[in-house]
Amino acid sequence: MSFGPSPAGFGPPPPPAWIPPTDTERALAEARARGDRSAYYDVLARVRLYYVMSREAYDAQPDRVHRVFVRDTRTGARHWELFTDGMLPAPRTDVVYSRNSLDWIADAWDPQCPPTIVVNPGTPCELALPYGPPGTTDWSHVARQAAPSMSMRLRALHVGGVLHGPVAHGLACGALLCVNNGSLWNALAWHGHGYDGERRRLREWWGITTRAEWQYHLRNLLACEASSSVWEFALSLRRTISRDFGGHVDTGYWRQAVATVIRADSEGSTVITKDGVTRTDPRPESETEARIEGVQRLIGRITRYEARMRADGILAENRYVTSVEAWDLGRASKMARWGLGARFATLAEAESAVARAGRTAAHSYRSWPDFSAGYILGRCLHFDEEEFGDWYQDMVAAHRILMSEAGSPWLNIPFR
Protein backbone atom coordinates (compact mmCIF):
# COMPACT_ATOMS: atom_id res chain seq x y z
CA MET A 1 0.00 0.00 0.00
CA SER A 2 1.36 3.44 -0.91
CA PHE A 3 0.62 6.92 0.45
CA GLY A 4 0.22 8.46 -3.01
CA PRO A 5 1.69 11.68 -4.35
CA SER A 6 0.89 14.19 -1.56
CA PRO A 7 -0.68 12.42 1.42
CA ALA A 8 -2.38 14.64 3.94
CA GLY A 9 -0.63 14.81 7.28
CA PHE A 10 2.81 13.86 5.92
CA GLY A 11 5.67 16.29 5.50
CA PRO A 12 9.34 15.90 4.59
CA PRO A 13 11.46 13.10 6.07
CA PRO A 14 12.56 13.58 9.68
CA PRO A 15 15.56 15.89 10.08
CA PRO A 16 18.94 14.12 10.41
CA ALA A 17 19.48 15.60 13.87
CA TRP A 18 16.46 13.84 15.32
CA ILE A 19 17.35 10.66 17.25
CA PRO A 20 14.42 8.26 17.73
CA PRO A 21 14.17 7.38 21.43
CA THR A 22 13.48 3.68 20.75
CA ASP A 23 13.25 1.17 17.94
CA THR A 24 9.51 1.84 17.72
CA GLU A 25 9.84 5.53 16.87
CA ARG A 26 12.61 4.75 14.42
CA ALA A 27 10.40 2.28 12.56
CA LEU A 28 7.49 4.75 12.51
CA ALA A 29 9.68 7.59 11.22
CA GLU A 30 11.15 5.39 8.50
CA ALA A 31 7.71 4.22 7.36
CA ARG A 32 6.47 7.80 7.37
CA ALA A 33 9.44 8.98 5.31
CA ARG A 34 8.87 6.18 2.76
CA GLY A 35 5.17 6.93 2.54
CA ASP A 36 4.36 3.38 3.58
CA ARG A 37 1.06 3.38 5.43
CA SER A 38 0.92 -0.40 5.78
CA ALA A 39 4.29 -0.50 7.52
CA TYR A 40 3.34 2.42 9.78
CA TYR A 41 0.09 0.78 10.83
CA ASP A 42 1.80 -2.56 11.34
CA VAL A 43 4.29 -1.00 13.77
CA LEU A 44 1.44 0.63 15.72
CA ALA A 45 -0.49 -2.63 15.83
CA ARG A 46 2.47 -4.47 17.38
CA VAL A 47 3.11 -2.08 20.30
CA ARG A 48 1.11 -0.74 23.21
CA LEU A 49 -0.07 2.85 22.89
CA TYR A 50 -0.55 5.35 25.69
CA TYR A 51 -3.14 8.09 26.11
CA VAL A 52 -3.84 10.66 28.81
CA MET A 53 -6.49 9.60 31.30
CA SER A 54 -8.17 11.44 34.15
CA ARG A 55 -6.52 10.39 37.41
CA GLU A 56 -9.33 11.83 39.50
CA ALA A 57 -11.97 10.00 37.49
CA TYR A 58 -10.05 6.70 37.59
CA ASP A 59 -9.47 6.88 41.34
CA ALA A 60 -13.23 7.40 41.79
CA GLN A 61 -14.29 4.73 39.27
CA PRO A 62 -11.40 2.37 38.49
CA ASP A 63 -13.63 -0.04 36.56
CA ARG A 64 -14.33 2.45 33.77
CA VAL A 65 -12.34 3.94 30.87
CA HIS A 66 -11.39 7.58 31.34
CA ARG A 67 -10.00 9.10 28.14
CA VAL A 68 -9.00 12.73 27.79
CA PHE A 69 -9.41 14.36 24.38
CA VAL A 70 -7.72 17.64 23.44
CA ARG A 71 -8.55 20.56 21.21
CA ASP A 72 -6.14 21.96 18.62
CA THR A 73 -5.45 25.58 19.61
CA ARG A 74 -5.02 26.56 15.95
CA THR A 75 -8.09 24.97 14.39
CA GLY A 76 -10.33 24.32 17.38
CA ALA A 77 -10.82 20.71 16.23
CA ARG A 78 -10.88 17.94 18.85
CA HIS A 79 -8.59 14.91 18.55
CA TRP A 80 -7.27 12.01 20.59
CA GLU A 81 -3.51 11.91 21.18
CA LEU A 82 -1.69 8.56 21.32
CA PHE A 83 1.95 8.03 22.27
CA THR A 84 4.48 5.22 21.91
CA ASP A 85 6.54 4.45 25.01
CA GLY A 86 9.64 6.34 23.86
CA MET A 87 7.70 9.60 23.54
CA LEU A 88 6.25 9.75 27.05
CA PRO A 89 7.35 12.59 29.36
CA ALA A 90 8.58 12.07 32.92
CA PRO A 91 5.72 11.06 35.24
CA ARG A 92 3.83 13.89 36.91
CA THR A 93 1.26 13.72 39.67
CA ASP A 94 -1.32 15.65 37.65
CA VAL A 95 -0.96 13.84 34.31
CA VAL A 96 -1.33 10.07 34.02
CA TYR A 97 -1.62 7.67 31.12
CA SER A 98 -3.41 4.45 30.31
CA ARG A 99 -2.09 1.87 27.84
CA ASN A 100 -3.79 -0.33 25.29
CA SER A 101 -3.52 -1.90 21.84
CA LEU A 102 -4.42 -0.36 18.49
CA ASP A 103 -7.14 -2.98 18.11
CA TRP A 104 -8.70 -1.91 21.43
CA ILE A 105 -8.50 1.74 20.35
CA ALA A 106 -10.39 0.92 17.14
CA ASP A 107 -13.13 -0.82 19.14
CA ALA A 108 -13.29 1.97 21.74
CA TRP A 109 -14.93 4.40 19.30
CA ASP A 110 -18.28 5.88 20.22
CA PRO A 111 -20.25 8.81 18.77
CA GLN A 112 -18.77 11.21 21.34
CA CYS A 113 -15.21 10.56 20.13
CA PRO A 114 -13.37 13.14 17.99
CA PRO A 115 -12.94 12.38 14.28
CA THR A 116 -9.16 12.24 14.42
CA ILE A 117 -6.38 10.41 16.28
CA VAL A 118 -2.89 11.94 16.32
CA VAL A 119 0.04 9.63 16.97
CA ASN A 120 3.11 11.14 18.67
CA PRO A 121 2.10 14.77 18.04
CA GLY A 122 4.86 17.28 17.37
CA THR A 123 7.48 14.67 16.39
CA PRO A 124 8.96 13.50 13.08
CA CYS A 125 6.90 10.30 13.39
CA GLU A 126 3.58 12.12 13.90
CA LEU A 127 0.60 10.95 11.90
CA ALA A 128 -3.09 11.90 11.97
CA LEU A 129 -5.51 8.98 11.58
CA PRO A 130 -9.23 9.20 10.85
CA TYR A 131 -11.29 7.84 13.75
CA GLY A 132 -14.66 6.30 13.08
CA PRO A 133 -16.85 3.29 13.85
CA PRO A 134 -14.97 -0.03 14.18
CA GLY A 135 -13.97 -1.50 10.84
CA THR A 136 -14.43 1.69 8.85
CA THR A 137 -10.80 2.85 8.68
CA ASP A 138 -7.87 1.29 6.83
CA TRP A 139 -5.70 1.23 9.97
CA SER A 140 -8.34 -0.66 11.97
CA HIS A 141 -8.18 -3.52 9.46
CA VAL A 142 -4.43 -3.83 10.07
CA ALA A 143 -5.05 -3.73 13.83
CA ARG A 144 -7.34 -6.75 13.50
CA GLN A 145 -4.61 -8.78 11.82
CA ALA A 146 -1.74 -8.03 14.23
CA ALA A 147 -1.31 -7.83 17.98
CA PRO A 148 1.26 -6.35 20.35
CA SER A 149 4.33 -8.55 20.40
CA MET A 150 4.71 -10.53 23.61
CA SER A 151 8.11 -11.99 22.69
CA MET A 152 10.95 -11.13 25.02
CA ARG A 153 13.59 -8.76 23.72
CA LEU A 154 16.16 -6.26 24.86
CA ARG A 155 14.92 -2.69 24.51
CA ALA A 156 16.50 0.58 25.63
CA LEU A 157 15.82 4.30 25.60
CA HIS A 158 18.48 5.89 23.38
CA VAL A 159 17.27 9.37 24.33
CA GLY A 160 16.25 10.17 27.90
CA GLY A 161 17.50 6.94 29.46
CA VAL A 162 20.65 6.47 31.53
CA LEU A 163 23.24 4.09 30.10
CA HIS A 164 26.13 4.38 32.59
CA GLY A 165 26.71 5.10 36.25
CA PRO A 166 25.10 4.01 39.56
CA VAL A 167 21.49 4.52 38.46
CA ALA A 168 22.03 2.59 35.22
CA HIS A 169 23.65 -0.19 37.28
CA GLY A 170 20.61 -0.35 39.55
CA LEU A 171 18.24 -0.35 36.58
CA ALA A 172 20.24 -3.21 35.04
CA CYS A 173 19.52 -5.25 38.19
CA GLY A 174 15.92 -5.39 36.95
CA ALA A 175 16.89 -6.19 33.36
CA LEU A 176 15.82 -9.85 33.47
CA LEU A 177 12.21 -8.82 34.03
CA CYS A 178 12.47 -5.98 31.50
CA VAL A 179 13.71 -8.34 28.79
CA ASN A 180 11.06 -10.89 29.71
CA ASN A 181 8.32 -8.25 29.33
CA GLY A 182 9.85 -6.40 26.37
CA SER A 183 9.99 -3.15 28.39
CA LEU A 184 12.72 -0.49 28.30
CA TRP A 185 15.43 -1.59 30.74
CA ASN A 186 16.82 1.92 31.34
CA ALA A 187 13.55 3.86 31.61
CA LEU A 188 13.69 5.36 35.09
CA ALA A 189 10.79 7.71 34.28
CA TRP A 190 8.48 4.70 34.31
CA HIS A 191 4.96 4.46 32.92
CA GLY A 192 4.92 0.69 32.42
CA HIS A 193 1.37 -0.59 32.03
CA GLY A 194 0.03 2.91 32.54
CA TYR A 195 -1.26 4.44 35.77
CA ASP A 196 -4.22 2.07 35.93
CA GLY A 197 -2.14 -0.96 34.92
CA GLU A 198 0.61 -0.28 37.47
CA ARG A 199 -1.97 0.19 40.22
CA ARG A 200 -3.59 -3.08 39.21
CA ARG A 201 -0.22 -4.89 39.08
CA LEU A 202 0.72 -3.78 42.59
CA ARG A 203 -2.72 -4.60 43.98
CA GLU A 204 -3.01 -8.06 42.44
CA TRP A 205 0.56 -9.29 42.88
CA TRP A 206 1.62 -7.51 46.08
CA GLY A 207 -1.56 -6.37 47.83
CA ILE A 208 -0.33 -2.77 47.57
CA THR A 209 -3.01 -0.08 47.44
CA THR A 210 -1.35 2.82 49.28
CA ARG A 211 1.94 4.68 49.33
CA ALA A 212 2.70 3.38 52.83
CA GLU A 213 2.27 -0.22 51.67
CA TRP A 214 4.52 0.43 48.69
CA GLN A 215 7.18 1.92 50.98
CA TYR A 216 6.96 -1.12 53.27
CA HIS A 217 7.52 -3.62 50.47
CA LEU A 218 10.31 -1.55 48.89
CA ARG A 219 12.14 -1.35 52.23
CA ASN A 220 11.88 -5.11 52.67
CA LEU A 221 13.20 -5.76 49.18
CA LEU A 222 16.11 -3.35 49.54
CA ALA A 223 17.01 -4.92 52.89
CA CYS A 224 16.77 -8.38 51.27
CA GLU A 225 14.15 -9.41 53.83
CA ALA A 226 11.25 -10.16 51.48
CA SER A 227 12.30 -13.74 50.65
CA SER A 228 12.44 -16.75 52.94
CA SER A 229 15.20 -16.45 55.54
CA VAL A 230 15.58 -20.24 55.37
CA TRP A 231 16.90 -20.01 51.79
CA GLU A 232 19.61 -17.58 52.82
CA PHE A 233 20.43 -19.56 55.96
CA ALA A 234 21.17 -22.67 53.89
CA LEU A 235 23.21 -20.81 51.29
CA SER A 236 25.16 -18.76 53.84
CA LEU A 237 26.12 -21.95 55.70
CA ARG A 238 27.49 -23.40 52.46
CA ARG A 239 29.39 -20.13 51.83
CA THR A 240 30.96 -20.39 55.29
CA ILE A 241 32.00 -24.01 54.76
CA SER A 242 33.48 -23.17 51.36
CA ARG A 243 35.39 -20.20 52.75
CA ASP A 244 36.72 -22.16 55.73
CA PHE A 245 37.73 -25.28 53.83
CA GLY A 246 38.48 -23.83 50.41
CA GLY A 247 36.34 -24.64 47.39
CA HIS A 248 33.83 -27.39 46.69
CA VAL A 249 31.33 -28.31 49.40
CA ASP A 250 30.07 -31.89 49.38
CA THR A 251 26.26 -31.96 49.50
CA GLY A 252 26.26 -34.65 52.17
CA TYR A 253 28.53 -32.59 54.38
CA TRP A 254 26.32 -29.55 53.80
CA ARG A 255 23.25 -31.49 54.93
CA GLN A 256 25.10 -32.74 58.01
CA ALA A 257 26.28 -29.21 58.86
CA VAL A 258 22.69 -27.97 58.65
CA ALA A 259 21.60 -30.61 61.15
CA THR A 260 24.47 -29.77 63.51
CA VAL A 261 23.78 -26.02 63.46
CA ILE A 262 20.01 -26.38 63.90
CA ARG A 263 20.39 -28.84 66.78
CA ALA A 264 22.87 -26.58 68.53
CA ASP A 265 20.55 -23.62 68.09
CA SER A 266 17.59 -25.59 69.43
CA GLU A 267 19.29 -26.27 72.78
CA GLY A 268 18.67 -22.75 73.94
CA SER A 269 21.21 -20.05 74.56
CA THR A 270 22.04 -16.96 76.54
CA VAL A 271 21.26 -13.74 74.74
CA ILE A 272 22.37 -10.27 75.84
CA THR A 273 19.71 -7.65 75.14
CA LYS A 274 19.22 -4.03 76.20
CA ASP A 275 17.17 -5.37 79.13
CA GLY A 276 19.98 -7.63 80.32
CA VAL A 277 20.86 -11.30 79.94
CA THR A 278 18.07 -13.53 78.64
CA ARG A 279 18.02 -17.31 78.40
CA THR A 280 16.09 -18.77 75.45
CA ASP A 281 14.26 -22.04 76.07
CA PRO A 282 15.21 -25.22 74.19
CA ARG A 283 12.95 -26.18 71.30
CA PRO A 284 11.06 -29.50 71.32
CA GLU A 285 12.98 -32.29 69.60
CA SER A 286 10.13 -32.94 67.13
CA GLU A 287 10.19 -29.29 66.02
CA THR A 288 13.97 -29.39 65.63
CA GLU A 289 13.93 -32.56 63.55
CA ALA A 290 11.14 -31.22 61.36
CA ARG A 291 13.16 -28.08 60.72
CA ILE A 292 16.25 -30.11 59.84
CA GLU A 293 14.24 -32.25 57.45
CA GLY A 294 12.76 -29.16 55.78
CA VAL A 295 16.12 -27.45 55.24
CA GLN A 296 17.67 -30.65 53.94
CA ARG A 297 14.83 -30.97 51.42
CA LEU A 298 15.56 -27.36 50.43
CA ILE A 299 19.22 -28.28 49.85
CA GLY A 300 18.04 -30.98 47.46
CA ARG A 301 15.95 -28.45 45.52
CA ILE A 302 18.84 -25.98 45.38
CA THR A 303 21.34 -28.52 44.11
CA ARG A 304 18.95 -29.77 41.44
CA TYR A 305 18.30 -26.23 40.21
CA GLU A 306 22.03 -25.55 40.17
CA ALA A 307 22.68 -28.70 38.16
CA ARG A 308 20.08 -27.60 35.61
CA MET A 309 21.54 -24.08 35.48
CA ARG A 310 25.00 -25.51 34.78
CA ALA A 311 23.55 -27.61 31.97
CA ASP A 312 21.83 -24.51 30.55
CA GLY A 313 24.92 -22.32 30.78
CA ILE A 314 23.68 -20.08 33.59
CA LEU A 315 26.24 -21.37 36.07
CA ALA A 316 29.82 -22.27 35.17
CA GLU A 317 31.10 -25.72 36.06
CA ASN A 318 31.96 -26.07 39.76
CA ARG A 319 30.17 -22.80 40.53
CA TYR A 320 27.18 -22.54 42.83
CA VAL A 321 24.72 -19.84 43.87
CA THR A 322 26.11 -17.85 46.77
CA SER A 323 22.94 -15.98 47.72
CA VAL A 324 19.38 -15.35 46.57
CA GLU A 325 19.49 -11.69 47.60
CA ALA A 326 19.45 -10.90 43.87
CA TRP A 327 15.81 -12.04 43.78
CA ASP A 328 14.91 -9.26 46.22
CA LEU A 329 17.25 -6.66 44.72
CA GLY A 330 16.08 -7.26 41.15
CA ARG A 331 12.50 -6.85 42.30
CA ALA A 332 13.45 -3.75 44.31
CA SER A 333 14.80 -2.19 41.12
CA LYS A 334 11.43 -2.82 39.52
CA MET A 335 9.35 -1.98 42.61
CA ALA A 336 10.85 1.50 42.62
CA ARG A 337 9.66 2.00 39.06
CA TRP A 338 6.28 0.35 39.59
CA GLY A 339 5.70 2.73 42.50
CA LEU A 340 6.50 5.69 40.27
CA GLY A 341 4.16 4.45 37.55
CA ALA A 342 1.39 4.08 40.16
CA ARG A 343 2.25 7.55 41.58
CA PHE A 344 3.11 6.14 44.99
CA ALA A 345 6.66 7.44 44.52
CA THR A 346 8.42 10.51 43.22
CA LEU A 347 11.07 10.35 40.53
CA ALA A 348 13.75 11.23 43.11
CA GLU A 349 12.61 8.40 45.41
CA ALA A 350 12.65 5.90 42.56
CA GLU A 351 16.13 7.00 41.49
CA SER A 352 17.48 6.70 45.04
CA ALA A 353 15.99 3.22 45.51
CA VAL A 354 17.29 1.97 42.17
CA ALA A 355 20.82 3.21 42.92
CA ARG A 356 20.70 1.57 46.37
CA ALA A 357 19.65 -1.75 44.85
CA GLY A 358 22.65 -1.58 42.54
CA ARG A 359 25.07 -0.76 45.38
CA THR A 360 23.81 -3.63 47.51
CA ALA A 361 24.04 -6.05 44.60
CA ALA A 362 27.66 -5.03 43.96
CA HIS A 363 28.51 -5.89 47.59
CA SER A 364 26.74 -9.25 47.47
CA TYR A 365 27.89 -10.61 44.10
CA ARG A 366 30.99 -10.61 41.92
CA SER A 367 29.51 -10.40 38.43
CA TRP A 368 26.33 -10.16 36.38
CA PRO A 369 26.27 -13.94 35.83
CA ASP A 370 26.53 -14.50 39.61
CA PHE A 371 23.72 -12.00 40.19
CA SER A 372 21.60 -13.61 37.48
CA ALA A 373 21.99 -17.10 38.95
CA GLY A 374 20.94 -15.81 42.38
CA TYR A 375 17.91 -14.08 40.90
CA ILE A 376 16.83 -17.13 38.89
CA LEU A 377 17.21 -19.48 41.85
CA GLY A 378 15.20 -17.17 44.10
CA ARG A 379 12.45 -16.84 41.50
CA CYS A 380 12.28 -20.60 41.06
CA LEU A 381 12.25 -21.35 44.79
CA HIS A 382 9.39 -18.87 45.07
CA PHE A 383 7.30 -19.94 42.08
CA ASP A 384 8.50 -22.94 40.12
CA GLU A 385 8.12 -26.01 42.41
CA GLU A 386 10.82 -27.84 40.38
CA GLU A 387 8.69 -27.96 37.29
CA PHE A 388 11.36 -26.12 35.27
CA GLY A 389 8.48 -24.43 33.48
CA ASP A 390 7.99 -20.83 32.37
CA TRP A 391 9.19 -19.38 35.68
CA TYR A 392 12.56 -20.97 34.91
CA GLN A 393 12.66 -21.12 31.12
CA ASP A 394 11.75 -17.45 30.65
CA MET A 395 14.65 -16.37 32.84
CA VAL A 396 17.07 -18.65 31.01
CA ALA A 397 16.06 -17.03 27.72
CA ALA A 398 16.35 -13.50 29.20
CA HIS A 399 19.75 -14.35 30.71
CA ARG A 400 21.07 -15.50 27.34
CA ILE A 401 19.89 -12.30 25.66
CA LEU A 402 21.54 -10.14 28.32
CA MET A 403 24.79 -12.10 28.10
CA SER A 404 25.01 -11.98 24.30
CA GLU A 405 23.41 -8.92 22.67
CA ALA A 406 25.75 -6.03 21.96
CA GLY A 407 23.52 -3.39 23.57
CA SER A 408 23.05 -5.32 26.81
CA PRO A 409 23.73 -3.39 30.02
CA TRP A 410 25.34 -6.53 31.41
CA LEU A 411 28.01 -6.32 28.72
CA ASN A 412 28.48 -2.55 28.97
CA ILE A 413 28.14 -1.68 32.66
CA PRO A 414 30.85 -3.06 34.99
CA PHE A 415 29.25 -4.99 37.82
CA ARG A 416 31.67 -3.51 40.32
Q: Language-model segments: which ranges?
A:
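Polar/charged low-complexity regulatory segments
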Residues: S2-A39, V68, D72, G76, ...
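Structured helix-beta-strand junction loops
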Residues: R46-V47, Q112
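Extended, Lys/Arg-enriched charged tracts that mediate electrostatic binding to polyanionic substrates
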Residues: Y41-L44, M53-R55, E81-L82, M87-R99
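Amphipathic, interaction-prone secondary-structure segments
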Residues: L49-T84
